[in-house]
Amino acid sequence: MKARNILFLILASLLLCTAVSAAEYTDVSDAHWAYKQINYLDAEITGYPDGTYKPENTVTRAEFLTLFARIAFQEEWKQAESDDWWKAAYSVCIAHDLLDGINGGRVNAMPRSEIAALLDRFCSGWGGVHERADAANQLNINWTEQRMESPEWQPLFPDAAEYGNSVLISANQGLLTGYPDGSFKPEKGVTRAEAAAILARLKAQLALREKGCEYVCTVGDYWLMQYPASGSVGLALYEPLTGKLVQTVGLWKAAQGVNGYVAFDRLLSGSDGIYVWGRAGL
């Protein structure tokens, strides 16, 4: 058991030590689906001594929570005193009441349902998060019989219904996505590539929030964000990882011609704004 723990500490340190860019990994080409996300996290995540990133390796609870804490609570994580590399992250997350229901061993894979619960709690204070989820859920209920015009529409993640709103909220916030078959696979762990994608979205949204932007939905390769305009509220499309403004969108206008996507298929009223749910690449 002692030897196993030592091995775990060695492997974990490889995930969290000196950072390099994705371009330097021999097993992550620029054609890899998570190349940009891995590169975006070059200050938080790293690879192995042999120059690989091992994108298909599964991430443990301790590893995911440490990376999460470094992004979500950077200064607190730096100041937290700990004898072990993973304890600072746990201490910070516990201080923010984020670990209720996350009781599995730290050396085990962190299932997607727990990641959803963690992100749900973390985002609970953000404006419109729960309203978007409620609106989307109501749409699913109301349109079970009356289908959307798009034949591709279906209720969000049927295999995650028992996990309450946490999966719905995390997905509606643009932080978690499902699989091509429409499933969420709540008990499945995440790979290093998937963890990078999830945490890159979180880091990017935190950066945009510092500019006063609120996430609305994903439109193709872009995020539709609500931003403060002079005397009103505006909508605009942003590149997620660069934060670059792509196109402004009026509140009541459809944004067309951006990668062939239409920003608005349906407009839903939330308690603090207008929320989008429908075809729009969601």
Stretches found by the model and what they are:
Residues 225-231, 266, 277-281:
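Beta-strand C-termini and the immediately following turn/loop, strongest in propeller blades
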Residues 178, 218-219, 226-228, 238-240, ...:
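Generic beta-strand structural signal
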Residues 1-5, 10:
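Positively charged n-region of N-terminal signal peptides that target proteins for export
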Residues 53, 184, 223, 233, ...:
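Hydrophobic residues embedded in beta-strands of well-ordered beta-sheets
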Residues 9, 17-212:
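N-terminal propeptides
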Residues 65, 116, 224-226, 275:
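Structural core positions within WD40/WD-like beta-propeller blades
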Residues 211-218, 253-271:
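Repeated scaffold domains used in trafficking and secretory/extracellular systems
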Residues 234-257, 281-282:
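Surface-exposed loop/turn elements that mediate protein-protein interactions on large endomembrane-trafficking
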